[in-house]
Amino acid sequence: LIQEIQRNLTEGRLDPESYVGAYYERIKRREAKVRAFITLRPMDEVIEDVKRSVERLRSGRHGRLEGILIAVKDNISTMGIRTTCGSKMLETYVPPFDATVIERIRREGGIIVGKTNMDEFAMGSTTETSYFGPTRNPWDLSRTPGGSSGGSGAALAAHFAELALGSDTGGSIRSPAAYNAVLGLKPSYGTVSRYGLIAYANSLEQIGPMARNANDLEVLYSVIAGPDERDATTVSAVLEKKEVRLNGLRLGVLDDMMEVSEKPVKSVVNDVLNKLSSEGSELKEVKLGYLDYALPAYYIIAMSEASSNLARYDGVRYGYSSGEEGLWTDVYSINRGAGFGWE
């Protein structure tokens, strides 16, 4: 738990050098094969950040994430830290500003350790379409970590960081969380600001937290959530933490989803449902009846918005430039052909 780390730092049982060094030793030992990061901050910079956090912890004036190392998906803008979207098109891009979620993390004392690998422009589900090479699952290097936030999921599973941020359009947080045996949340649309997210499908994409336990997930979510005047899609309602008792809680179970799930998945879900039922929850089967249209609708929206959003990367205004000269249509085609991958 992040509270335990903060307590150990405050009381001196954990010093900044050994604390940060333990993460970087794991990264040094395994990163060459896992490839969770695109950009990793120098260890000495991170140690200095932690030293400042320890001072604030001991003064009693500290944030909720004080001193905690966080991995950030590489489509979330971080001032002064390269942000590539896993693409040659943005290979050298260093944002001059922070995304709102990064501002909030920094304000609460969180420390960015690096930017994680991802499917190019978040279009993929295996983290294999990155210009920087594929990420592997730390539990089994022959397997995928899921995607498109596979680098964030892998970084958590390998204990390269304590918390992580991902983005989710059609499963890009939830899939890596499941594949890497960690936790991930796609927040309800509008609860987390998307300002500074390099999105490919604005109507669907959300930034969300990832962690190794529910307590830490809740803390990170509470930090990044909330209205933002720079994102008109955020909701103005104040988010409140509520205690929910399982006894008497009414839960819907999507029957049509269970019908198409594989046996191992059904087994795990049924185990959870039985546990909830034994705790006094009321389970009600729900059949939506229109799930056959969900995936086609998703692809129509996502691909339409992707074609619009990615049109700006032409090598003239934004993105990789081949340096070729000629008719503008030819130059656009050459730049985009060289800057984008096959996905």
Task: Please report, for each region that a protein language model flagged, where it lies by residue.
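Short glycine/serine-rich loop segments
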Residues: 97-224
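A short helix-breaking turn/cap at a secondary-structure junction
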Residues: 186-267, 325-334
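DPxDG-like acidic metal-binding loop motif
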Residues: 79-92, 158
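Flexible, acidic active-site loops/lids enriched in D/E/S/T/G that coordinate Mg2+ and/or position polar
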Residues: 43-66, 72, 91-95, 105, ...
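Acyltransferase
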Residues: 13-20, 51, 261-287, 314, ...
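Short helix-loop capping/hinge segments that flank enzyme active sites or metal/cofactor-binding pockets
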Residues: 65-85, 246-254, 304-343
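Conserved small-residue hinge/capping positions at short loops/turns
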Residues: 61-84, 111-114, 118, 276, ...
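An N-terminal boundary/leader segment
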Residues: 1-48, 278-280
